[in-house]
Design a protein with these regions (language model features):
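Short, contiguous clusters of charged residues that form electrostatic/catalytic patches at enzyme active sites
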Residues: 59-66, 217, 379-382
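Active-site-adjacent structural elements in enzyme catalytic domains
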Residues: 25-32, 38-41, 47-77, 82-126, ...
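C-terminal functional module detector
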Residues: 1-52, 78-91, 95, 196-213, ...
Length: 679
């Protein structure tokens, strides 16, 4: 790695963009942002940027600022690189870039606000206890003045162990020989970041004299450390139902039971990103436990097919083609081997010769909006909102607002403004052709989209106003489109009470109003101010010659759906308390949106703690990865063949953005209502 260079930042444009025509309401405006963006200071993003993985090269923090300001025309964003990979030098450069990005705006005419932040990245290892899986969480800081010396990570997990391995440098150099400069730069980065010890390994004197990485192995340790440092910070779970890192039977409720939740910091939930949708709860099981504690494979249902069962079917079909006697034995043996390795990321490789399309739709919930890959239902937003746990002398539950963001790993904040350039605007990746023997094509690459946004109701584009609204949950998520959404409780004395609020009622039936207006349709290319602010090479490299460029015409809202959840301690029967949808309203949108009012006449009778939120869904438009597996159906509507959206190998078509029609949508934050004096 001595021939390579450590990461450097780029140049932030000193130009501002013209003021946005913000969406005015009587008191507040709606601002759109992205609170989950990775630069190539993140170890995984740097790795995926390499030529061996068809990467497009380095994207440092300055790129995130320039992209947010000119390409996606956001109002706010945050760089959230993985703390576990950041050195102090990289953290300092990120903060400097964040401050420089803000400095372009004058206080009187702010065009973009950048928040400091990082990702705390935790997961249990193979065979680990699912109750000790807490997942990935972004830490977003209010201030740019009171900052930690280094970000707080969760310790090495997953990809870190592969990259830290002693054989990695040799394997990389040999696999893609001769190496390019960026390959050597990555090895220098790897050697530097993984040579820095954890602060827990040093004494106080050593910590003062040398660099170390701060670690908090649990959310509780993270919350406590944020308190010790007096940091005004929000901690936002994300990608929770994504099976890439979450064990099959992991559950958000375990964090309530184990004192791993802080209701003052963990007030938001990233329900949608470029890594999929984590909204819905479905009673599905990837495996079951027998009475003697062993793993077993459940039978498929009309709604869900476990991959262990599909593994058995593939093995049986291979056996029958070879004419090898009793194929049921082969099926049962393969099913059992799969569930025995249910936490092993190599489990899909147990059947020699099986291709991604052979697995059909296994592991995926059906008839839902872009669910995360190998879905974990008890880690979903609905499961979290429905769960209540008695822990010690307290009753714990989640009261979480819903946001979206991109989780883009190429510094492209707010990348979903147009549906194009699947790999650049999303995170789909795969090895180049001569290396697919080492990293074979896999079906998970089909499940990446261009990502979502967080929308904030705030008085003006001001750091404190935005952060206050984030704290108050007066926010909502979108799938990337700038849909306008209002959702209020109408109280006879208090008037309108906005999304994210908590209230107790005893004599008043809860009545609500909801209004949604579709996003602007887009023109091709970039606005004139982009061409006067960025040189053409930067517009091509960063924006790919396409920017947020709205017309005056809006997409139409197709319908509005209401979800009602009664909070419960019966965690084994969450499907009984989640009504999705509870109500649905068809819109007659003529370009101005639609609005409805409704009342829950059962609330005063049932006297439950109840959660309400709404989804506003646009008429169908084409989207990247809109139909990840592209099923071919038979006459009965059964999926008999898939055409995965490959990212590598002989079936990868770089011109195919895998476009399919979807109903782009917005999810409101919930309104939390309890019957007065209920617990």
């Amino acid at each position: 790695g001595s021939l390579g260079s450590l990461p450097e930042d780029g140049q932030i444009s000193l130009e501002k963009r013209p003021p946005n025509n913000s969406e005015n309401v009587i008191e507040k405006q709606i601002f759109f942002g992205d609170l989950h963006v990775h630069t190539t200071f993140s170890q995984d993003a740097f790795f995926f940027s390499l030529p061996m993985l068809q990467g497009e090269g380095a994207h440092p923090p300055a790129d995130a600022c320039n992209f947010a300001r000119f390409c996606s025309s956001l109002d706010f964003f945050s760089i959230t690189d993985h703390a576990e990979g950041l050195t102090k030098d990289m953290w300092d450069k990120t903060i400097q870039a964040t401050k420089s990005c803000n400095a372009v705006s004058s206080n009187a005419d702010t065009d973009l606000i950048a928040f400091a932040g990082w990702e705390w990245t935790q997961m249990v290892g193979e065979g680990g206890n699912p109750d000790e899986h807490y997942g990935h969480k972004n830490v977003i800081l209010r201030d740019l003045d009171n900052l930690p010396k280094v970000p707080i990570g969760a310790g090495l997990t997953g990809l870190d162990y592969i990259l830290k391995s002693r054989i990695t440098p040799s394997l990389m150099l040999l696999a893609d020989f001769p190496p390019e400069k960026i390959d050597l730069d990555f090895l220098a980065y790897r050697n530097e970041t993984y040579s820095i010890p954890s602060c827990s390994q040093l004494n106080e004197k050593e910590i003062l004299q040398s660099e170390c990485k701060e670690e908090a192995s649990t959310p509780r340790e993270l919350f406590d450390r944020l308190d010790e440092l007096n940091l005004d910070a929000l901690v936002i779970p994300h990608g929770t139902s994504w099976g890439i890192h979450a064990p099959a039977n992991s559950s958000m409720s375990s964090q309530l039971d184990m004192n791993q939740h802080d209701p003052d910091r963990q007030r938001l939930f990233e329900v949608y990103s470029g890594h999929g949708n984590s909204e819905v709860y479905k009673d599905i099981k990837h495996f079951i436990k027998t009475d003697d504690g062993k793993n077993a494979c459940p039978e498929p249902t009309s709604e869900f097919e476990p991959c262990c069962w599909r593994a058995g079917e593939i093995a049986r079909q291979q056996c029958e083609l070879k004419g090898e006697g009793s194929c049921e034995d082969s099926k049962e043996k393969t099913e059992q081997e799969f569930v025995n390795r249910i936490t092993d990321i190599t489990r899909f490789g147990i059947i020699q010769g099986a291709m991604p399309e052979d697995w059909l739709q296994c592991g995926q919930i059906q008839d839902e909006f872009l669910p995360a890959y190998t879905y974990r239902p008890k880690m979903s937003a609905q499961a979290a909102l429905a769960s209540k746990v008695i822990s010690g002398n307290s009753v714990n539950r989640f009261k979480l607002g819903l946001i979206g963001s991109t989780d883009n790993h190429k510094a492209r904040a707010g990348s979903g403004y147009k549906e194009f350039a699947r790999k650049a605007m999303g995170d789909s990746w795969g090895a180049k052709d001569n290396l697919t023997w080492l990293i074979p094509p896999e079906r998970g690459a089909s499940f990446y989209s261009t990502g979502g946004l967080v929308a904030v109701h705030a008085k003006s584009l001001d750091r404190n106003y935005l952060f206050d609204s984030l704290y108050n949950r007066e926010v909502y998520a979108t799938s990337g489109e700038r849909i306008l959404l209002w959702f209020d409780l109408i109280h006879p004395l208090l008037g309108k009470i906005p999304m994210g609020s908590e209230i107790s009622l005893k004599q008043t039936e809860p009545s609500f109003s909801v209004k949604a207006i579709g996003s602007f349709k887009q023109k091709p290319g970039c606005p004139d101010y982009v061409h006067t602010s960025l040189d053409k090479n930067k517009i091509s490299r960063l924006c790919l010659n396409e920017c947020y460029n709205p017309t005056n015409e809006r997409n139409k809202i197709d319908r509005i759906e209401v979800v009602k959840i009664n909070v419960t301690m019966d965690l084994d029967n969450l499907d009984r308390v989640i009504q999705d949808p509870w109500k649905a309203f068809k819109c007659q949108d003529k370009g101005e949106g639609c609005s409805f009012q409704f009342t829950d006449s059962d609330f005063l009778i049932d006297k439950n703690e109840t959660v309400y939120y709404v989804r506003a869904i646009q008429e169908a438009t084409l989207a990247v990865g809109g139909d990840p597996l592209r099923c071919v159906l038979d006459e009965e509507g059964e999926c008999v063949k898939t055409v995965p959206c490959y990212a590598s190998g002989s079936k990868f078509d770089p011109k195919d953005d895998c476009l399919a029609p979807i109903g782009e949508r917005a999810w409101s934050s919930p309104i939390f209502i309890s019957y007065e004096n209920s617990t």
